[in-house]
Structures are given as structure tokens and as C-alpha cells.
């Protein structure tokens, strides 16, 4: 459990960093054999790319670093429940385990919304563990959007 907490803490660092760059504060860390292979926050505004979610970024970085298109045996830690696009990427990458913090009833696609991994079109479903650092993950998002509303 201490290892899981450590990796989620790194994802929270990435989320905070994303928020400081005026990105929606979501962070992700990809781990293989107990080693961090990639870590990132959202980069959609920085790259002007709607697909530059934290999950997609770490999958791309890890595939490049390892020289392979799939990541069997890898674990992904994310501060927010992945959306449909990210859930599909997780499936295609053959991620072994997904750990996420806060649920996303509006945009999530794992235990909310379309429940992507339960669909017959899903090729691979990771083991899913939700609620890891849930309150911290949710608070980072709440604070970010609270400040956005004050700025408007």
C-alpha cells in the first residue's frame, strides 16, 4: 500500500503542476516493475491538442521510452477517473492496473458514464482500483475551478 500511495502522490504533484500552468489539474504516473517510466499532467492548452490528457501523455512517453506500442504489466496512477478517450487508450495499451483518485460523474468512463471496460468493444480491461487519494484529488480540482470562477 505504501508503494501505491507514493505513486499516487507523484500523480498529485503532476496535477498541481498542471494547474499552475493553467491546465485542468490532472496528473498521471505510469509504473513498470516498480519503476516510474513516465509522469505528466494535462497539456491540452500548452500543446493546443485536445488529446493531450495526462493519461495519453504518459502512455505515449512510456511507449517511446520502452520502444514498444503496448504496455503489458504496467500500472497507471491518475488523479481523476479517465474519460472515454483515455479509457480506450488504456485498453489498447494493455495497461495491467489502473488506480485513480476522484470519480468524474460528468466525464468519467470507468465507473461512471459509458463504463468503457464493461463494453463488448473493449479489447482489454485493466484491474481497476478507485478512491486512492480521492479527497486530495478532488480538492485540487475544486480549488482550481473555484479560482477560475473568481477570475471571471
From Swiss-Prot:
Its EC number is 3.5.4.33. Residues 2-111 form the CMP/dCMP-type deaminase domain. Keywords: Hydrolase, Metal-binding, tRNA processing, Zinc. Changing residue 145 to A: Lack of activity. One of its GO terms (molecular function) is zinc ion binding. It catalyses: adenosine(34) in tRNA + H2O + H(+) = inosine(34) in tRNA + NH4(+). The active site is at residue 55. Binds 1 zinc ion per subunit. Transmembrane segments: none annotated. GO terms for biological process: tRNA wobble adenosine to inosine editing. InterPro entries: APOBEC/CMP_deaminase_Zn-bd, CMP_dCMP_dom, Cytidine_deaminase-like, tRNA_aden_deaminase. Zn(2+) binds at residues 53, 83, 86. Homodimer. PANTHER family: CYTOSINE DEAMINASE FAMILY MEMBER, TRNA-SPECIFIC ADENOSINE DEAMINASE. Catalyzes the deamination of adenosine to inosine at the wobble position 34 of tRNA(Arg2). Belongs to the cytidine and deoxycytidylate deaminase family. This is tRNA-specific adenosine deaminase. It comes from Agrobacterium fabrum (strain C58 / ATCC 33970) (Agrobacterium tumefaciens (strain C58)).
